[in-house]
Protein backbone atom coordinates (compact mmCIF):
# COMPACT_ATOMS: atom_id res chain seq x y z
CA UNK A 1 0.00 0.00 0.00
CA UNK A 2 1.61 3.30 -1.02
CA UNK A 3 2.12 6.02 1.66
CA UNK A 4 0.23 9.29 1.48
CA UNK A 5 1.82 12.71 1.22
CA UNK A 6 1.63 13.33 5.01
CA UNK A 7 3.75 10.25 5.68
CA UNK A 8 6.48 11.17 3.23
CA UNK A 9 8.23 13.41 5.75
CA UNK A 10 9.07 10.35 7.90
CA UNK A 11 11.03 8.76 5.04
CA UNK A 12 14.76 9.57 4.69
CA UNK A 13 16.21 11.08 1.59
CA UNK A 14 16.92 8.68 -1.27
CA UNK A 15 13.87 6.44 -0.70
CA UNK A 16 10.93 6.23 -3.05
CA UNK A 17 7.57 6.64 -1.25
CA UNK A 18 5.86 4.35 -3.75
CA UNK A 19 8.26 1.53 -2.92
CA UNK A 20 7.06 1.24 0.73
CA UNK A 21 4.34 -1.47 0.72
CA UNK A 22 2.63 -3.54 3.43
CA UNK A 23 3.32 -7.24 3.65
CA UNK A 24 0.15 -9.08 4.75
CA UNK A 25 2.03 -12.13 5.88
CA UNK A 26 4.51 -10.37 8.18
CA UNK A 27 2.11 -7.52 9.21
CA UNK A 28 4.61 -4.69 8.91
CA UNK A 29 5.59 -2.17 6.28
CA UNK A 30 8.65 -2.98 4.24
CA UNK A 31 10.33 -0.36 2.07
CA UNK A 32 11.74 -1.30 -1.28
CA UNK A 33 15.27 -1.63 0.12
CA UNK A 34 17.15 -4.74 1.31
CA UNK A 35 16.92 -3.71 5.03
CA UNK A 36 13.68 -4.92 6.67
CA UNK A 37 14.67 -3.47 10.10
CA UNK A 38 14.50 0.07 8.76
CA UNK A 39 11.06 -0.72 7.38
CA UNK A 40 9.89 -1.62 10.89
CA UNK A 41 10.78 1.82 12.13
CA UNK A 42 8.79 3.43 9.35
CA UNK A 43 5.87 1.06 9.97
CA UNK A 44 5.84 2.04 13.64
CA UNK A 45 5.76 5.70 12.71
CA UNK A 46 2.90 4.97 10.34
CA UNK A 47 0.92 3.12 13.02
CA UNK A 48 1.51 5.97 15.45
CA UNK A 49 -0.78 8.18 13.38
CA UNK A 50 -3.69 5.73 13.82
CA UNK A 51 -3.44 5.34 17.58
CA UNK A 52 -5.82 6.93 20.06
CA UNK A 53 -4.65 10.01 22.05
CA UNK A 54 -3.62 8.04 25.19
CA UNK A 55 -1.36 5.79 23.13
CA UNK A 56 -0.07 8.74 21.16
CA UNK A 57 0.95 10.36 24.46
CA UNK A 58 2.88 7.20 25.30
CA UNK A 59 4.53 6.79 21.95
CA UNK A 60 5.32 10.48 21.53
CA UNK A 61 7.81 10.19 24.41
CA UNK A 62 9.62 7.25 22.88
CA UNK A 63 13.38 7.52 23.19
CA UNK A 64 14.64 8.80 19.84
CA UNK A 65 18.14 7.72 20.67
CA UNK A 66 17.14 4.05 20.48
CA UNK A 67 15.66 4.65 17.07
CA UNK A 68 18.82 6.41 16.02
CA UNK A 69 20.90 3.50 17.29
CA UNK A 70 18.83 1.13 15.18
CA UNK A 71 19.33 3.32 12.13
CA UNK A 72 23.06 3.57 12.81
CA UNK A 73 23.17 -0.19 13.30
CA UNK A 74 21.44 -0.64 9.97
CA UNK A 75 23.82 1.78 8.31
CA UNK A 76 26.75 -0.15 9.77
CA UNK A 77 25.30 -3.36 8.40
CA UNK A 78 25.00 -1.84 4.94
CA UNK A 79 28.61 -0.71 5.05
CA UNK A 80 30.12 -3.81 6.68
CA UNK A 81 27.76 -6.33 5.20
CA UNK A 82 26.63 -7.82 8.57
CA UNK A 83 24.81 -6.57 11.70
CA UNK A 84 25.29 -7.67 15.28
CA UNK A 85 23.10 -10.53 16.30
CA UNK A 86 21.86 -8.67 19.41
CA UNK A 87 20.62 -5.78 17.31
CA UNK A 88 18.64 -8.16 15.11
CA UNK A 89 17.09 -9.86 18.12
CA UNK A 90 16.12 -6.55 19.67
CA UNK A 91 14.68 -5.34 16.39
CA UNK A 92 12.53 -8.43 16.06
CA UNK A 93 10.75 -7.83 19.34
CA UNK A 94 7.19 -6.63 18.88
CA UNK A 95 4.45 -5.42 21.22
CA UNK A 96 0.71 -5.81 20.81
CA UNK A 97 -1.52 -2.97 22.00
CA UNK A 98 -5.24 -3.42 22.67
CA UNK A 99 -7.31 -0.31 22.03
CA UNK A 100 -10.65 -0.58 23.91
CA UNK A 101 -11.74 3.03 23.51
CA UNK A 102 -15.43 3.44 22.89
CA UNK A 103 -17.43 0.35 21.99
CA UNK A 104 -14.80 -1.11 19.64
CA UNK A 105 -11.70 -3.14 20.41
CA UNK A 106 -8.78 -2.88 18.03
CA UNK A 107 -5.53 -4.80 17.97
CA UNK A 108 -2.51 -2.68 17.13
CA UNK A 109 1.04 -3.86 16.55
CA UNK A 110 4.06 -1.82 17.54
CA UNK A 111 7.28 -2.55 15.67
CA UNK A 112 9.73 -1.25 18.33
CA UNK A 113 10.07 -1.95 22.07
CA UNK A 114 8.49 0.54 24.42
CA UNK A 115 10.68 1.78 27.24
CA UNK A 116 9.37 3.83 30.12
CA UNK A 117 11.97 6.04 31.76
CA UNK A 118 11.69 7.10 35.37
CA UNK A 119 10.29 10.47 34.31
CA UNK A 120 7.29 8.79 32.64
CA UNK A 121 6.05 6.86 35.70
CA UNK A 122 3.53 9.50 36.65
CA UNK A 123 2.16 9.80 33.12
CA UNK A 124 2.00 6.01 32.76
CA UNK A 125 -0.01 5.83 35.98
CA UNK A 126 -2.44 8.44 34.66
CA UNK A 127 -2.93 6.53 31.38
CA UNK A 128 -3.43 3.21 33.15
CA UNK A 129 -5.87 4.87 35.48
CA UNK A 130 -7.85 6.17 32.50
CA UNK A 131 -7.95 2.69 30.90
CA UNK A 132 -8.50 0.66 34.09
CA UNK A 133 -9.68 2.81 36.99
CA UNK A 134 -9.85 -0.18 39.34
CA UNK A 135 -6.19 -1.12 38.63
CA UNK A 136 -4.72 2.27 37.89
CA UNK A 137 -3.38 3.00 41.37
CA UNK A 138 0.39 2.80 41.67
CA UNK A 139 2.56 2.26 44.74
CA UNK A 140 3.02 5.99 45.12
CA UNK A 141 -0.72 6.44 45.44
CA UNK A 142 -0.84 3.65 48.01
CA UNK A 143 2.01 5.25 49.97
CA UNK A 144 0.28 8.63 49.83
CA UNK A 145 -2.95 7.04 51.02
CA UNK A 146 -1.08 5.37 53.90
CA UNK A 147 0.52 8.70 54.81
CA UNK A 148 -2.86 10.41 54.70
CA UNK A 149 -4.40 7.65 56.81
CA UNK A 150 -1.53 7.94 59.28
CA UNK A 151 -2.00 11.71 59.45
CA UNK A 152 -5.75 11.25 59.92
CA UNK A 153 -5.03 8.72 62.67
CA UNK A 154 -2.65 11.16 64.37
CA UNK A 155 -5.20 13.96 64.02
CA UNK A 156 -7.83 11.66 65.50
CA UNK A 157 -5.55 10.83 68.41
CA UNK A 158 -4.83 14.54 68.97
CA UNK A 159 -8.55 15.30 68.87
CA UNK A 160 -9.23 12.48 71.35
CA UNK A 161 -6.44 13.76 73.62
CA UNK A 162 -7.84 17.29 73.45
CA UNK A 163 -11.29 15.91 74.24
CA UNK A 164 -9.92 13.97 77.22
CA UNK A 165 -8.03 17.07 78.44
CA UNK A 166 -11.19 19.18 78.26
CA UNK A 167 -13.13 16.49 80.16
CA UNK A 168 -10.46 16.39 82.88
CA UNK A 169 -10.47 20.20 83.18
CA UNK A 170 -14.28 20.25 83.45
CA UNK A 171 -14.14 17.51 86.08
CA UNK A 172 -11.61 19.50 88.11
CA UNK A 173 -13.72 22.65 87.84
CA UNK A 174 -16.85 20.79 88.93
CA UNK A 175 -14.95 19.20 91.81
CA UNK A 176 -13.75 22.67 92.92
CA UNK A 177 -17.33 23.94 92.82
CA UNK A 178 -18.50 20.96 94.88
CA UNK A 179 -15.71 21.56 97.40
CA UNK A 180 -16.71 25.22 97.70
CA UNK A 181 -20.32 24.19 98.22
CA UNK A 182 -19.23 21.73 100.91
CA UNK A 183 -17.18 24.43 102.66
CA UNK A 184 -20.14 26.80 102.55
CA UNK A 185 -22.43 24.15 103.99
CA UNK A 186 -19.88 23.41 106.74
CA UNK A 187 -19.69 27.12 107.56
CA UNK A 188 -23.44 27.27 107.81
CA UNK A 189 -23.50 24.26 110.11
CA UNK A 190 -20.74 25.71 112.28
CA UNK A 191 -22.54 29.03 112.54
CA UNK A 192 -25.91 27.49 113.39
CA UNK A 193 -25.80 23.86 114.53
CA UNK A 194 -22.49 23.74 116.41
CA UNK A 195 -22.86 27.05 118.30
CA UNK A 196 -23.09 26.77 122.13
CA UNK A 197 -26.39 28.62 122.18
CA UNK A 198 -28.02 26.17 124.58
CA UNK A 199 -25.34 26.67 127.26
CA UNK A 200 -25.67 30.45 127.10
CA UNK A 201 -29.42 30.18 127.22
CA UNK A 202 -29.23 28.03 130.34
CA UNK A 203 -26.90 30.58 131.99
CA UNK A 204 -29.33 33.39 131.17
CA UNK A 205 -32.19 31.40 132.63
CA UNK A 206 -30.18 30.91 135.86
CA UNK A 207 -29.49 34.66 136.19
CA UNK A 208 -33.16 35.53 135.62
CA UNK A 209 -34.26 33.06 138.30
CA UNK A 210 -31.80 34.53 140.82
CA UNK A 211 -32.98 38.08 140.03
CA UNK A 212 -36.57 37.04 140.54
CA UNK A 213 -35.70 35.61 143.95
CA UNK A 214 -33.91 38.82 145.03
CA UNK A 215 -36.82 40.99 143.91
CA UNK A 216 -39.32 38.84 145.76
CA UNK A 217 -37.35 39.10 149.01
CA UNK A 218 -36.40 42.80 148.89
CA UNK A 219 -38.79 45.77 148.52
CA UNK A 220 -38.04 49.45 147.88
CA UNK A 221 -34.90 51.24 146.62
CA UNK A 222 -32.45 49.03 148.51
CA UNK A 223 -29.21 47.64 147.19
CA UNK A 224 -29.53 44.12 145.90
CA UNK A 225 -27.15 41.31 145.44
CA UNK A 226 -26.65 39.87 141.96
CA UNK A 227 -24.87 36.64 141.33
CA UNK A 228 -22.91 36.80 138.08
CA UNK A 229 -21.67 34.00 135.85
CA UNK A 230 -18.19 34.02 137.46
CA UNK A 231 -19.82 33.49 140.91
CA UNK A 232 -18.80 36.97 142.16
CA UNK A 233 -21.12 39.23 144.19
CA UNK A 234 -21.44 42.93 143.55
CA UNK A 235 -23.79 45.66 144.79
CA UNK A 236 -26.24 47.05 142.30
CA UNK A 237 -29.13 49.47 142.32
CA UNK A 238 -32.74 48.32 141.83
CA UNK A 239 -32.92 50.11 138.49
CA UNK A 240 -29.90 48.18 137.26
CA UNK A 241 -31.42 44.94 138.49
CA UNK A 242 -34.60 45.68 136.58
CA UNK A 243 -32.73 46.37 133.38
CA UNK A 244 -30.67 43.21 133.74
CA UNK A 245 -33.81 41.22 134.32
CA UNK A 246 -35.40 42.53 131.14
CA UNK A 247 -32.20 41.89 129.23
CA UNK A 248 -31.91 38.37 130.62
CA UNK A 249 -35.45 37.57 129.58
CA UNK A 250 -34.87 38.91 126.07
CA UNK A 251 -31.57 37.04 125.70
CA UNK A 252 -33.36 33.75 125.19
CA UNK A 253 -34.35 34.71 121.65
CA UNK A 254 -31.09 36.43 120.74
CA UNK A 255 -28.25 34.81 118.71
CA UNK A 256 -24.83 33.98 120.13
CA UNK A 257 -23.16 37.23 119.02
CA UNK A 258 -25.84 39.35 120.71
CA UNK A 259 -25.54 37.34 123.93
CA UNK A 260 -21.78 37.81 124.06
CA UNK A 261 -22.17 41.54 123.39
CA UNK A 262 -24.76 41.82 126.16
CA UNK A 263 -22.46 40.05 128.55
CA UNK A 264 -19.65 42.43 127.67
CA UNK A 265 -21.92 45.44 128.20
CA UNK A 266 -23.06 43.98 131.53
CA UNK A 267 -19.48 43.64 132.74
CA UNK A 268 -18.80 47.22 131.56
CA UNK A 269 -21.82 48.52 133.48
CA UNK A 270 -20.70 46.75 136.62
CA UNK A 271 -17.23 48.32 136.33
CA UNK A 272 -18.77 51.75 135.83
CA UNK A 273 -21.01 51.24 138.84
CA UNK A 274 -18.04 50.33 140.98
CA UNK A 275 -16.28 53.52 139.88
CA UNK A 276 -19.33 55.57 140.80
CA UNK A 277 -19.44 53.88 144.18
CA UNK A 278 -15.82 54.81 144.79
CA UNK A 279 -16.52 58.45 143.87
CA UNK A 280 -19.48 58.56 146.21
CA UNK A 281 -17.40 57.20 149.07
CA UNK A 282 -14.68 59.81 148.40
CA UNK A 283 -17.25 62.62 148.38
CA UNK A 284 -18.69 61.41 151.72
CA UNK A 285 -15.19 61.47 153.21
CA UNK A 286 -14.66 65.05 151.99
CA UNK A 287 -18.03 66.10 153.43
CA UNK A 288 -17.04 64.70 156.78
CA UNK A 289 -13.64 66.45 156.74
CA UNK A 290 -14.43 69.87 155.24
CA UNK A 291 -16.49 71.98 157.63
CA UNK A 292 -19.80 73.24 156.25
CA UNK A 293 -19.67 71.08 153.08
CA UNK A 294 -22.59 68.76 153.74
CA UNK A 295 -25.45 68.86 151.25
CA UNK A 296 -23.46 70.69 148.57
CA UNK A 297 -22.90 69.62 145.02
CA UNK A 298 -19.86 67.61 144.02
CA UNK A 299 -18.08 70.48 142.19
CA UNK A 300 -18.58 72.97 145.03
CA UNK A 301 -17.52 70.29 147.49
CA UNK A 302 -14.30 69.76 145.56
CA UNK A 303 -13.55 73.52 145.43
CA UNK A 304 -14.09 73.95 149.16
CA UNK A 305 -11.98 70.89 149.85
CA UNK A 306 -9.11 72.36 147.79
CA UNK A 307 -9.31 75.72 149.56
CA UNK A 308 -9.43 74.00 152.91
CA UNK A 309 -6.34 71.94 152.09
CA UNK A 310 -4.44 75.08 151.03
CA UNK A 311 -5.41 76.79 154.27
CA UNK A 312 -4.22 73.82 156.26
CA UNK A 313 -0.92 73.86 154.41
CA UNK A 314 -0.36 77.56 155.12
CA UNK A 315 -1.20 77.16 158.76
CA UNK A 316 1.15 74.21 158.97
CA UNK A 317 3.98 76.18 157.40
CA UNK A 318 3.38 79.15 159.72
CA UNK A 319 3.37 76.93 162.73
CA UNK A 320 6.68 75.40 161.67
CA UNK A 321 8.19 78.86 161.28
CA UNK A 322 7.13 79.89 164.76
CA UNK A 323 8.62 76.78 166.24
CA UNK A 324 11.93 77.40 164.49
CA UNK A 325 11.94 81.01 165.67
CA UNK A 326 11.57 80.05 169.29
From Swiss-Prot:
Subcellular location: Nucleus
One of the record's GO molecular function terms: protein dimerization activity
Subunit structure: Homodimer.
bHLH domain residues: 263-312
Pfam families, alphabetized: bHLH_SAC51 (PF23173)
Segments of this protein annotated with the region Disordered: 175-194, 234-275
Record field: transmembrane: none
Organism of provenance: Arabidopsis thaliana (Mouse-ear cress)
GO biological processes: regulation of DNA-templated transcription
Residue stretches of biased makeup (Polar residues): 255-271
InterPro entries, A to Z: bHLH_dom, HLH_DNA-bd_sf, SAC51-like
Protein name as catalogued: Transcription factor bHLH143
Disulfide bonds: none
Acidic residues bias: start-end ranges: 175-189
Alphabetized UniProt keyword annotations: DNA-binding, Nucleus, Transcription, Transcription regulation
Record-level GO cellular component terms: nucleus
Amino acid sequence: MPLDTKQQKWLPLGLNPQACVQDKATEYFRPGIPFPELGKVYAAEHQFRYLQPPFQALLSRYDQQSCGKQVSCLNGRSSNGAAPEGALKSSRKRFIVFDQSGEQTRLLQCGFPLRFPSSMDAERGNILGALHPEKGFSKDHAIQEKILQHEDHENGEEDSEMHEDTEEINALLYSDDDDNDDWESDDEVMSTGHSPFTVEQQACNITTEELDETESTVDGPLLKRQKLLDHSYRDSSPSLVGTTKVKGLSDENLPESNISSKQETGSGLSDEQSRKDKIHTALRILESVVPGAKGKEALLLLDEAIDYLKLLKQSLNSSKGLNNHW
